[in-house]
Amino acid sequence: MVITRRSLLTASAGGLAVMGLSRNMAWAAELPKLKKKDVYKVGFAQTESNNPWRLAQTQSMKDEAAKRGWQLVYTDAAGSAAKEVSDVRSMIAQRVDVILLAPREEKPLVPAVMEAKNAGIPLFCIDRSVDATLAKPGRDYVAFIGSDFVKEGQMCGVLFAKAVGNKAKIIQLEGTTGSSPANDRAKGFKDAIKDFPDMQIIASQSGDFARDKGRQVFEALYQAHPEATALYSHNDEMSMGAIAAMEAAGKTPGKDLLIASIDGTKDAAQAVADGKIAVLVECNPHFGPKAFQAIVDYADGKEIPTWVVNTDRTFTKDNIQGYMPEAF
């Protein structure tokens, strides 16, 4: 199964060298094996910890490690792809048994994936994938564990079209440039609204999945496009920043501009209940149980799908109350 879910040009050997991969480096031909053990030393390379989604994901990992009595080597790249590559290299030097990597971006983390393979350490990509034209699941790393970001975008688009009556001038707040969720959520949403000519994305820019930057970017885009009637945001943090900007400008979220968002944080769920967000698509951050079970299954010799899919739900004001206790 193809992980990145979008067409990409095959990189040349020269392109790999530019990315920091040596043309002469001999990669291991097969995936590293994992011995069956009662206790594993697991490396978890987190991309950042600046939002509720990442904090919930990290806590899920820590809780599952504690539950199983395993050692978790945790690093936080603080939003830096270069640091995340360094973090993985440190884990390789520490000889962890297995690595769980949440890649900051698709291309820059490929060297880390390949170096783990060459060092004989199995690696799983979680939440985000790497560029499958350069490193493939089932060949270069065990599997991708995460949501279908294209489908998330599609679900947002389908429900949002219904909410706006198939007519809207949309500002899009994109996630981190070059990341798989940003790429795929944009594609899914665009695919979902292509049959509605009166639904148009009139402005689009990255807010880097951050609340403050999302607010700043939305303010600038809305000032440039006051005719906008809707906002599609790739995550809840940017949505909440945009809501603050709307309210500061004297606008009413949910009336002056309808909003579609992705993640499922407590703030966003409350905003749905309050009528400020029209459509909310879940992106489940609780990876611990599924990721750690995949490690056990791999050690047991079971066949691991190249894509272990997290299932996500959709929410509107009609059904949000049942989700509120689960929101993170």
Predicted regions and their residues:
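N-terminal secretory signal peptides and thylakoid transit peptides that target proteins
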Residues: 1-16
